[in-house]
Amino acid sequence: MNTILKTVIISFILVSPGMASASFISPETAWHRMADRSNKVYSFKNGVPKLEYTLSKAGVPTLYLFNSDGHTFCVSADDEVPALLGYADKTYSMRDVSPAFEAWLNTMAEEIGRVREGSASRNEMETRSNDFASIAPLCKTQWNQDAPYNNVCPKPKGETQRAYTGCVATAMAQVMKYHNWPLTGEGEISYNWNNLTLHEDFSTTSFDWKNMLDIYTEGEYSEEEGIAVARLMRSCGIGVEMSYSTSGSGALSQLIGGALGKYFKYDKSRLRYLMRDFFSLDEWEEMIYGSLQNDGPVILDGQSNQGGHSFVCDGYDKDGYFHINWGWGGTSDGYYLLSVLDPYNQGIGGSGDNSGFNYMQDAIIGIVPAKDDNSNNSWIGQLYSMGPLDIDTSVNYTPGEVIGPFCNDGIYNFGPAALPVNTELGLLFSNEVTGEKYIDYGVFEEGCGVMYGFSGVSLPVPMGITDGTYRVTLSYRAPQEDADEADEPRLDSEGWLDVYFPIGETASYTANVSEGIVTVEDSSWRPSGVEETYLLPADDSPRYFNLQGIEIKAPRKGELVIQKRGKEVKKIFI
């Protein structure tokens, strides 16, 4: 132990001679601090740990990896953060770990670095303590991305080697194997990759679950068993339009939920895509745990400065330690903190050199087989704003007057499904005393696909709103069958969904309505719904008007206008 410690300290002095004033603790101190504070390693604290790896930031240690008595422990090198960051029930070397696990280590190092720099405080990094019951790891599989998993993946032109499955496909496949679902898929897809057209008719694809092994060891599985898992992996990859490569295949995590619902018969009404930066740490852990408990394994994804990685969260110990299956043949699978910091207050569009899974981390929850006709389940994407709601509070408004443009940083649909044609978007006014809700909305004439968005929104104060104090939020909902029939204000609070805003950004306002004057004040909280529309006289030719009835010759992109096309009159976003 002393020899290891001397080697580490000498190497740091050579790299960073001015580090004497830096805040860090030695490997020996870090190990004993962790052993004293964590009952998870109580039985091992008298053993002789081996320092496997040290990760530094700016030449100063941030965390240590120890192997001891057949276990691995990730331990903080700073006494201002939780002592134990993660642990696994077997030892491993950094030479063998997955890129996803390596990126998680970098995340922890970045967050510890922010504490040292003063941009995060100790109380933000306390180990979580909650009443969640333990959930043993749900996935028995220890799958990877190479043979036999990629045995039917495409071969890039001019190469003899098959492309890797991709971490997205491996994560999807392991969750689907847990459910042993579906027996056959539905729908079909074609897309271009590397000057080739990749196609699959999922309705003719059957999945041979009984012949898929939990662990594949070379020379210990049959051809039938190898093909069974390889075909599943290929179907998952094609379903998310995988960009295949022999150096590493990739796909957008935002497409996972859509593929599961559209091609693999998972319950569309349960699937949700969540972004980490829009929720507190408590909210995030509660949603992940709730899905684990009620639906099964969750797919997590994180963006680091080295790219994105998808992996499976399939269990829970306690105090915030979730079981992670990294999709690397079982290597480094274990219990880890999802994060030790709440999301950065600067939001997604903020500046700075932020890196790690706490930045642009996301999750696909509610992965459960459809128990009925999946085509009839509700199916709508989630809108995320990349910045604040940003309503001008320096002026007063009147009912019918347009507020905006706001949300100039953009609002995007991150799935799992496209927003249908005529999806409604409006400012929802909810009376804080009576609960009455008013909303005037526009519609998306062409819908909004996954990964598409808009900015510079302008929307009116609802007509007919009564005096009182209201909460104002930006809300949307699926098209309503009777939307064109309403020509009078009506209270209708069904089906409205929140547009999500990053933690730390203004997401809502307080509006005081008195004798027809609306005063808006900055006051963040979350939303609810209603609607009201009014129609202008029909015209025989397509024309555009603003919400005050003045004709517009050249509407601006993102502007809410009234379109008259023959006898049809509706509000739309250009």
Regions found by a protein language model. Give the residues of each.
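C-terminal outer-membrane/trafficking sorting elements
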Residues: 18-19, 527-574
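Cys-His-centered catalytic/binding microenvironment captured across papain-like cysteine peptidases
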Residues: 23-59, 73-74, 79-141, 293, ...
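Active-site-adjacent substructure of cysteine-protease-like catalytic cores
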Residues: 47-69, 258, 262-325, 333
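Active-site-adjacent structural segments surrounding the nucleophilic cysteine of cysteine proteases
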Residues: 81-249
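Aromatic sugar-binding surface patches on proteins
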Residues: 445-460
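Surface-exposed, short loops/turns at beta-strand junctions within beta-sandwich domains
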Residues: 460-469, 554-557
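Short beta-strand elements
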Residues: 480-527
